[in-house]
Design a protein with these regions (language model features):
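Conserved hydrophobic/aromatic beta-strand scaffold that supports enzyme active sites
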Residues: 30, 40, 102-104, 123
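NUDIX/MutT-family hydrolases
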Residues: 104, 113-145
Length: 151
């Protein structure tokens, strides 16, 4: 009986590793202009408005990933100074294990063109977001509004 238990336990352990969601780490940037409006992007391949960002590549730091994604999606370049981290958020929808680090960016300039994957880049007041803003984006903006958008 103990042999059967051991076999079942080992089988359970192996199968449970296949059930586990792959951990992914991504970055999003809440870029503010001089009027505290928020930069949002609309992708060419999906509906809705989102904070710019994306996945962190193997060997890439969080800051480097944020800088790369901002450059690709918005043309925004950042100075050498560190940016503010607002928080780390998790999503376990659709059997995923996504973890997103949200940065607040106030010091930036435009210096490059936008990737063809981006249909539109625009700035919006936090209380006047466009129709189609994703629920997660809206939640992040509300959370940041309490700490970073106060004059």
């Amino acid at each position: 009986m103990s042999d059967l238990r051991g076999l079942l336990f080992r089988l359970y352990k192996r199968l449970s590793t296949f059930r586990r969601a792959k951990l992914t780490i991504g970055v999003r940037a809440l870029v503010l202009d001089e009027e505290n409006r928020i930069c949002l992007v609309r992708h060419s391949y999906r509906d809705g408005w989102y904070l710019p960002g994306g996945g962190v590549k193997t060997g890439e730091s969080l800051v480097d990933a944020m800088q790369r994604e901002l450059r690709e999606e918005t043309g925004v370049e950042l100075p050498e100074t560190p940016q503010s981290v607002h928080g780390v958020f998790s999503s376990f929808r659709e059997h995923k294990s996504d973890h997103i680090v949200v940065f607040v960016v106030k010091d930036w300039s435009i210096s490059s063109s936008v990737s063809p994957e981006i249909a539109e880049v625009a700035f919006f007041a936090s209380d006047d977001l466009p129709d189609g803003t994703s629920a997660a984006t809206t939640r992040r903006i509300k959370a940041v509004s309490y700490t970073h958008l106060r004059a």
